[in-house]
Design a protein with these regions (language model features):
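Outer-membrane beta-barrel "beta-signal"
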Residues: 101-107, 179-192
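Short glycine/proline- and aromatic-enriched beta-strand/turn motifs that initiate or cap beta-hairpins
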Residues: 15-60
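Membrane-embedded beta-strands of outer-membrane beta-barrel proteins
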Residues: 34, 54, 103, 127, ...
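Short loop/turn motifs that connect adjacent beta-strands in outer-membrane beta-barrel proteins
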Residues: 22-30, 45-48, 63, 111-123, ...
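Residues that define the transmembrane beta-barrel architecture of outer-membrane proteins
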Residues: 30-32, 48-52, 97-101, 123, ...
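Gram-negative (and chloroplast) outer-membrane scaffold detector with strong preference
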Residues: 62-137, 141
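Transmembrane beta-barrel strands of outer-membrane/channel proteins
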Residues: 36-40, 52, 68-72, 107, ...
Length: 192
């Protein structure tokens, strides 16, 4: 009986399809990754801050490399802040973000691939740390950011990159000088 069960298992295994393992296709070493994306800076300070992002990362090794990021914000007061301003003349003491320039390091944490509908999706899970300046309506404020995200290969040279980040800036305000914000980003790019 045991021999029959073993023969049945072996017969089923022999009929199984061959598993295809794709080689690593997402190589970064010696390449520059450039991207353009959309973002939103949320600081709970009465400013609505949608924006655009331009980013470039050079990978001297497969593990990571220096990165520069430029953000442009199209900020406006929220509806509640506009109502208060029009009725009382008061405006928030938070600065209006106009642009953000950051330089730092992007590190690949792990490489993976997932089979979806017969196609392999290659991706990197990454983390990044940056420093720079937040350009506002009242000058420049020092800023520091940290983010985590995924870089996924969409074609031979095209990639998508969602990032979730935090931004800490130091501004002159009534109660506090530190402003912490949430900075999600979605960008599409090409590697050169």
């Amino acid at each position: 009986m045991k021999a029959a069960a073993l023969m049945l298992v072996c017969a089923l295994a022999a009929r199984a399809e061959d598993v295809r393992v794709e080689p690593r296709q997402f190589s970064k070493q010696g390449r520059i990754f450039t991207s353009l994306g959309v973002t939103w800076l949320e600081r709970s300070d009465y400013w609505l801050n949608p924006g655009l992002l331009l980013s470039a990362t050079y990978y001297p090794t497969e593990r990571g490399g220096p990165e520069a990021r430029l953000f442009w914000f199209f900020s406006s007061l929220s509806d509640s802040a506009q109502r208060i301003s029009s009725s009382t003349g008061f405006v928030p003491d938070a600065r209006q973000p106009e642009a953000l320039a950051l330089i730092g390091w992007r590190q690949s944490l792990t490489y993976g691939k997932v089979a979806i509908a017969g196609t392999a999706l290659h991706f990197d899970v990454q983390g990044a740390a940056h420093g720079g300046g937040l350009f506002t309506d009242r000058g420049i404020a020092p800023a520091f950011g940290a983010s985590a995200g995924i870089v996924g290969r969409l074609g031979s040279h095209v990639f998508a990159q969602p990032d979730l980040g935090l931004l800490l800036s130091f501004e002159q305000r009534q109660k506090s000088t530190a402003a912490l914000g949430f900075l999600p980003v979605f960008s599409l790019g090409v590697d050169l």
